Amino acid sequence: MATKKKVAGLIKLQIQAGQANPAPPVGPALGQHGVNIMEFCKAYNAATENQRGQVIPVEITVYEDRSFTFALKTPPAAKLLLDAAGVGKGVAEPHKTKVVKVSWDQVREIAETKKADLNANDIDAAAKIIAGTARSMGITVE
């Protein structure tokens, strides 16, 4: 049985799919842990090539021997809601002004996408979490 590697750190980043490069925020975050930055950038870009244009969160586990593994997450719920609503950003005062409306079907579709990353037992609970995110952005769910 192989011995377990000892974890030296955990790094969480949100990077455009297929566009990781050594510039900030990627370079400094990985550099302080001694990780080969170009190796990560090439692996991340290859893994996210088919999702270009989206922000993909990544969780990088760095080991003491300076090797690493990474796990891709689903795009942020806020970004998916903005895409579904067709707007660039939410409002400054979300509970006073509402910008746009999305349907429950769109919310359920986003919930199905995000289900793996949400702390929800079923799609209805996940949809309620997404609806709460929408409300906090000034998006009405109907």
Curated annotation (Swiss-Prot):
Transmembrane segments: none
A Pfam family annotated for this UniProt entry: Ribosomal_L11_N
CDD domains tied to this protein: Ribosomal_L11
GO CC terms of this entry: cytosolic large ribosomal subunit
Alphabetically ordered keywords of this record: Methylation, Ribonucleoprotein, Ribosomal protein, RNA-binding, rRNA-binding
Gene3D superfamilies: Ribosomal protein L11, C-terminal domain, Ribosomal protein L11/L12, N-terminal domain
Single annotated GO MF: large ribosomal subunit rRNA binding
GO terms, biological process: translation
InterPro entries: Ribosomal_uL11 (IPR000911), Ribosomal_uL11_bac-typ (IPR006519), Ribosomal_uL11_C (IPR020783), Ribosomal_uL11_C_sf (IPR036769), Ribosomal_uL11_CS (IPR020785), Ribosomal_uL11_N (IPR020784), Ribosomal_uL11_N_sf (IPR036796)
SMART domains per the UniProt record, alphabetical: RL11 (SM00649)
Protein modification: One or more lysine residues are methylated.
HAMAP family per record: Ribosomal_uL11 (MF_00736)
Subunit-structure text: Part of the ribosomal stalk of the 50S ribosomal subunit. Interacts with L10 and the large rRNA to form the base of the stalk. L10 forms an elongated spine to which L12 dimers bind in a sequential fashion forming a multimeric L10(L12)X complex.
Family, as annotated: Belongs to the universal ribosomal protein uL11 family.
Function as written in the Swiss-Prot or TrEMBL entry: Forms part of the ribosomal stalk which helps the ribosome interact with GTP-bound translation factors.
Name of the protein in its database record: Large ribosomal subunit protein uL11
Native species: Mycobacterium leprae (strain TN)
